A protein has these predicted regions:
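Adenine nucleotide-associated cytosolic modules
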Residues: 1-549
Length: 549
């Protein structure tokens, strides 16, 4: 919570029924000796310390147990954007998860147990506008330029257009070196179509020929814009329409597969899911119509399609045919990469892309307004700014839905295979064993009414109890206790976990707290993709792994 408050989270509420004790002094930085001496509720001490870190953050505390709140006033959790629960056992976590899902509230479960840390996000539906992929190429639309972009490229032409490279024939060397590579490629596309019966390049062989033609334009060998054009030549490649297609557009559009999955999600067909329609899905529905048109079938496409045979430089995408009035393209974001050019030419080109982005966003907003009217909602309930933001990041849209904790605990053949694979992989063996043993710890707690290993005189019995609980869990998945693990490995890990007792080590908690803060921001802001599954941190071997069941 310290990292969240320092980051300006806005408002926090701490729920805890305990009173500050001497044990907290070694485990919780927010508790000091004066808090212990005065018998202050631990939640009050934590809030006092947290709010002192950032004056812009407000906070409150509730002195109560989770069990009491769940039993008497579960609606308490409905007010929150995110519930972060720490140190809960399996049954407690499942009960809280069920309540949060019922209210559509995101939950994050964090647990530190000795040298092991566990983190699990649980969301019924998490809509991500800015997934921020590691590599997102600029959307320049060179294979299918719009009229204003073509006109911009045409403005560089010198001569009567009779010769193949007449654009550059009368340019001096300095002017030639500063022609933006976008213009070079657009003219190269025009020349290609002129000599290939109007067909656009669509194969790897075409790409190699294009690059050779571009390199042939070098004069002194130091033209950086030519090198940039060669590096971006793959952007001219277009999917080749199939022969069975009922229509043959000059350039089929492409939509990233992750985004296509969002556009084709049942929730994008407003009202089909039976749940309250959020602004996100209304705008996605408008984007779907913008791309595919209002005549798209259940898959978001009309008959026809194509494939693209290109080298690895090309972005992995799926083809989408036109339907109705669909543009077959996502709204352009309007951004430009750096390139060799004069300042005047670059700014003029930027204006062309900015104007196109604004035009696309306006078109989507008009669809949104129409849909709002059809739903009987005020068209001011979704602002043009919100639509523009989603259009700008249209290529980064994703939707995440996690299995509930209850579903995760239910054995299936698929989960059995995943556990076997994780245990056999040397990089994930230890984390998987710790994951299973922490579940076994909670089962052992039910019979012992304490954590295994809390009392030295009961250590051997606790090890046996914990091992039996772990074997029972493996048996539920139809797995032999030995599997393909080295002899005695499960016993060794059971002894290690029992050795922890109920210890909560500060160093492990600190690392896990940092990860939890990062995941919390992902869930609150709708940026980046949260961890899908249970993340296990093994501080013994300094390893981490995600167990997705």
């Amino acid at each position: 919570m310290k990292a969240l408050v320092l980051g300006g989270i806005g408002c926090v509420t701490v729920v805890d029924a305990c009173v500050c004790s001497a044990a907290d002094l070694g485990e919780n930085y927010a508790v000091n000796a004066s808090h212990v001496a005065s018998g202050l509720p631990r939640c009050a001490a934590i809030i006092e310390s947290l709010l002192g870190l950032n004056d812009n953050v407000s906070g409150s505390y509730v002195e109560d147990t989770l069990a009491n709140i769940l039993e008497k006033r579960a609606e308490f959790f409905e007010q929150f954007t995110l519930v972060v629960a720490t140190q809960l056992r399996e049954k407690e976590a499942m009960a809280l998860d069920k309540v949060c899902r019922g209210f559509g509230v995101k939950a994050l479960f964090v647990r530190s147990h000795g040298m092991v840390g566990v983190l699990r996000a649980s969301v019924r539906e998490h809509c991500i506008i800015e997934s921020k992929p590691d590599h997102l190429p600029h959307d320049l639309r060179l294979s299918n330029p719009w009229p204003e972009l073509s006109a911009f490229a045409e403005s560089f032409r010198i001569g009567d257009g009779a010769k193949e490279y007449d654009l550059y024939e009368h340019m001096d060397d300095m002017t030639f070196k500063h022609v933006p590579y976008v213009v070079l490629l657009l003219h190269m596309l025009e020349q290609w179509k002129r000599t290939h019966d109007g067909e656009a390049p669509c194969t790897s062989a075409d790409l190699r020929e294009l690059k050779a033609n571009i390199r042939a334009m070098l004069r002194k060998g130091d033209e950086e814009n030519i090198r940039e054009a060669v590096a971006a030549a793959h952007r001219l490649i277009s999917p080749k329409p199939s022969s069975s297609s009922s229509s043959s557009p000059s350039s089929a559009a492409t939509v990233p597969s992750e985004v296509a999955a969002v556009l084709n999600d049942p929730a994008a067909r407003l009202g089909d899911t039976g749940t309250a329609v959020t602004n996100f899905w209304i705008i996605v529905s408008a984007l779907r119509e913008f791309v595919y048109g209002d005549g798209a079938d259940d898959n978001g496409t009309s008959p026809g399609g194509g494939c693209m045979d290109t080298d690895s430089e090309s972005e992995s995408r799926i083809s989408a045919s036109s339907a109705g009035m669909g543009t077959r393209e996502l709204p352009i974001d309007g951004s430009l990469p750096d390139m060799t050019s004069t300042t005047e030419s670059y700014l003029a080109l930027q204006e062309v892309y900015t104007a196109k982005a604004a035009s696309d966003a306006d078109a989507v907003y008009n669809i949104v307004r129409r849909k709002l009217a059809e739903m009987g909602r005020d068209d001011a309930s979704i602002s043009p700014v919100e639509v523009k933001h989603m259009c700008k990041h249209a290529r980064c849209l994703q939707v995440v839905r996690h299995a509930s904790l209850e579903e995760e605990m239910q054995p299936t053949d698929l989960k059995r295979g995943k556990i076997e694979q994780l245990l056999e992989d040397e990089t994930t063996t230890s984390c998987t064993l710790f994951y299973l043993l922490l579940r076994a710890v909670d089962r052992a707690y039910e019979s012992l009414n304490r954590y295994p290993g809390e009392f030295n005189e009961e250590l051997e019995n606790d090890i046996s109890t914990l091992r039996s609980s772990a074997v029972s869990i493996l048996g539920e998945y139809g797995l032999s206790q030995n599997l393909n693990l080295p002899l005695g490995l499960l016993d060794d890990y059971a002894k290690e976990v029992c050795r922890y007792g109920s210890a909560e080590l500060h160093v492990v908690s600190a690392i896990l707290g940092g990860i939890a803060a990062q995941e919390s921001l992902k869930l609150i802001l709708g940026q980046y993709i949260p961890i899908a599954g249970t993340y296990v941190f093994d501080a013994v071997h300094m390893l981490g792994a995600t167990i997705a069941l």
